[in-house]
């Protein structure tokens, strides 16, 4: 069973989660405007998981699946930095001991630095707290 087939099987237990799929990818659609998309791709060197503009590559299928599930949980938040209306940086934060802690970030090299920055926080609450996987 491929990782995509595994995800589809696990997501089927959550009919409220909407997603689109391709042969080597799956993308969960945010539940509303306060959420963010979560994607999973099989690539030649392993797997890529993305939360909107943020992304990370994995060689371990289990780690990639865990990261994907984390993006659907209330323990994950995405801080999106905008300059004007342009999204320029995405910071993945995790909830630890009641505090949001930055884990990883992805940003654009070229951005409209002359525009003032603001932060939008986006969060999915599609899985219960502490669920390690989309089971």
Annotate each language-model stretch with its function.
Residues 12-16, 70-76:
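Structural alpha-beta junctions
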Residues 51-59:
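A short, exposed loop/beta-hairpin motif centered on an aromatic-Gly-Thr core
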Residues 15-45:
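Amphipathic, interaction-prone secondary-structure segments
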Residues 33, 41-48, 72-76, 97:
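Short, solvent-exposed coil/turn segments at beta-strand boundaries
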Residues 73-135:
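Acidic, proline/glycine-rich low-complexity IDRs
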Residues 1-15:
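Amphipathic alpha-helical segments
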Residues 60-72:
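A short, charged, amphipathic alpha-helix used as a generic interaction element across diverse proteins
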Residues 25-31, 48-51, 89-92:
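Generic recognition of long tandem-repeat/solenoid scaffolds
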């Amino acid at each position: 069973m491929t990782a995509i087939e595994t995800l589809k099987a696990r997501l089927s237990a959550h009919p409220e989660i909407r997603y689109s799929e391709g042969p080597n990818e799956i993308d969960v659609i945010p539940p509303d405007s306060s959420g963010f998309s979560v994607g999973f791709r099989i690539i030649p060197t392993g797997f890529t998981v993305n939360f909107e503009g943020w992304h990370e590559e994995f060689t371990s299928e289990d780690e990639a699946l865990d990261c994907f599930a984390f993006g659907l949980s209330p323990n994950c938040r995405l801080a999106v930095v905008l300059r004007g209306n342009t999204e320029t940086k995405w910071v993945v934060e995790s909830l630890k001991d009641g505090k949001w802690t930055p884990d990883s970030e992805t940003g654009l090299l070229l951005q409209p630095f002359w525009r003032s920055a603001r932060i939008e926080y986006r969060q999915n609450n599609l899985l219960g707290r502490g669920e390690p996987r989309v089971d």
